[in-house]
């Protein structure tokens, strides 16, 4: 269902979750920039662009984590996702190469100099991707600056990473990966599930690779990342027998975007997961041309970055316009020409 907060003949921005029975109450606040889906004969009379005040817009750079060990093992055999050996999966050597390439890209394109905040999901693979991509070039002896990552953190052979001249990093639970039920594997490959393991189906419902480590451990490995928004040291959100439904992921994602819109920063990087991105971004683009909808919501590959404009269409943003100029209200005889023009 498409939200009708704008006039019916405008379709610049998205405010619905297509697979839900009714619109999310909070979704109408936000939009991702896209084109109109107007018929060709209407293009000359109806605008195909969106026009919003600049101070109500943010640029967000969405990044999926680089290749993790769970990605490799899962490609070989889907059953591997159920292995405790993949608990809080770390990056592979190829994953770190992907991070190095993305690091070069954000520096060469100027993105790294514009970003004011890096938001990251508190799992090892996303933390490693975030600091490797948006962190400093490396720690140097004698430079008194906090470390984004200690040397060798997370079974890596990487040197320490400095936060020198880098933006703040903050970990947020609400952009974590979704929980996946074993039913997926039951449908994907029925024969692997023997009757003796059927009882496990009732209690073992999600991937251990999506369960995070304690925050105490993360603070030791990533000293300069702010974990203050995470309320519990242990992972109380991951459940061994509960599957988060797609619509719930979308709702969580929309709430996360709402939170982004309240931040003072105007350009933000978010390092997160493919499932979270797919379900959240699928909430947008339903009144766009199909090619634009696909550009918004298609699945991310490892270490992919896409940039969007996030628009707050309500009055939730309190930031004043920084580039507007009020002009001068004329009085007396000088006002006559303006008054005449308004009649």
From Swiss-Prot:
GO terms for cellular component: chloroplast. The keyword Transit peptide applies. It is found in: Plastid, Chloroplast. Residues 1-35 form a transit peptide. SMART domains: PGAM. The active site is at residues 65, 177. This is Phosphoglycerate mutase-like protein 2. The lineage of its organism: Eukaryota, Viridiplantae, Streptophyta, Embryophyta, Tracheophyta.
């Amino acid at each position: 269902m498409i939200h009708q907060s704008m006039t019916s003949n405008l379709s610049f921005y998205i405010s619905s979750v297509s697979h839900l029975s009714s619109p999310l109450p909070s979704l109408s606040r936000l939009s991702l920039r896209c084109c109109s889906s107007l018929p060709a004969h209407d293009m000359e009379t109806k605008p195909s662009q969106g026009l919003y005040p600049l101070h109500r817009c943010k640029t967000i750079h969405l990044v999926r984590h680089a290749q993790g060990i769970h990605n490799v093992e899962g490609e070989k055999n889907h059953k591997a996702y159920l292995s405790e050996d993949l608990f809080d999966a770390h990056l592979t050597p190829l994953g770190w190469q992907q991070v190095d390439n993305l690091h070069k890209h954000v520096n060469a394109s100027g993105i790294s100099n514009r970003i004011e905040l890096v938001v990251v999901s508190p799992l090892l693979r996303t933390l490693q991707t975030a600091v490797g991509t948006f962190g400093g070039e490396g720690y140097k002896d004698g430079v008194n600056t906090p470390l984004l990552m200690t040397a060798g953190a997370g079974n890596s052979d990487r040197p320490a990473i400095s936060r020198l001249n880098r933006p703040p990093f903050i970990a947020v639970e609400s952009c974590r990966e979704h929980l996946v039920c074993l039913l997926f594997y039951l449908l994907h490959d029925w024969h692997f599930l023997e009757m003796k393991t059927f009882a496990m189906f009732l209690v073992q419902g999600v991937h251990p690779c999506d369960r995070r480590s304690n925050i105490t451990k993360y603070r030791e490995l990533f000293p300069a990342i702010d974990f203050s928004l995470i309320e519990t040291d242990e992972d109380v959100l991951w459940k061994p027998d509960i599957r988060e439904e797609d619509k719930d992921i979308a709702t969580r994602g929309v709430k996360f975007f709402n939170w982004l819109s309240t931040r003072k920063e105007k350009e933000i990087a978010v390092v997160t997961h493919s499932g979270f991105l797919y379900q959240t971004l699928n909430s947008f683009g339903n009144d766009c041309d199909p090619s634009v909808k696909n550009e918004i919501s298609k699945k991310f590959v490892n270490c992919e970055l896409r940039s969007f404009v996030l628009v707050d269409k309500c009055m939730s943003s309190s930031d004043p316009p920084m580039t507007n100029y009020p002009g001068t209200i004329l009085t007396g005889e000088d006002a006559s020409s303006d008054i005449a023009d308004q009649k």
